Curated annotation (Swiss-Prot):
Belongs to the conotoxin A superfamily. This is Alpha-conotoxin TiIA. The modification Cysteine amide is found at residue 16. It comes from Conus tinianus (Variable cone). One of its GO terms (molecular function) is ion channel regulator activity.
Length: 16
């Protein structure tokens, strides 16, 4: 869940 479930965040793990 959370941001890590969004492709945009998967491409930017620093945001997870």
């Amino acid at each position: 869940g959370g941001c890590c479930s969004h492709p945009a965040c998967q491409n930017n793990p620093d945001y997870c």
